[in-house]
A protein has these predicted regions:
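Short, charged recognition helix plus adjacent turn
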Residues: 19, 56, 64-73
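A short, Lys/Arg-rich alpha-helix, primarily the initiator
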Residues: 1-21
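Short alpha-helical DNA-recognition segment
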Residues: 20-38
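Residues that mark the N-terminal boundary/hinge immediately upstream of a DNA-recognition element
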Residues: 10, 21, 47-50, 61
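Short, basic-rich loop-to-helix N-cap that marks the start of a DNA-contacting helix
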Residues: 43-56
């Protein structure tokens, strides 16, 4: 089983600080819970739209999220 990526860890840490979970993120970002899980666990690369929606939902800039993604590749 693959561990969370730095991208996934960053998002999960922010969700924890906000008292929210993946289901909340899915609802607030307009993404399916399955897609959110796949992204956070590194099984699926997020689309630009998904990164944008996630950034708005958790209050982290799209630049920071994108940098984290680029650092992993």
């Amino acid at each position: 089983m693959k561990t969370k990526t730095r991208f996934g860890v960053l998002i999960c840490n922010q969700l924890s600080k906000m008292g929210k979970n993946q289901k909340d993120l899915a609802q607030e970002s307009g993404l399916s819970p399955f897609y959110v899980s796949e992204i956070l666990n590194g099984k699926h690369n997020p689309s630009v739209r998904a990164v944008y929606n996630i950034s708005k939902a958790i209050g982290i800039s799209i630049e920071e999220l994108t940098k984290t993604l680029l650092d992993e590749s």
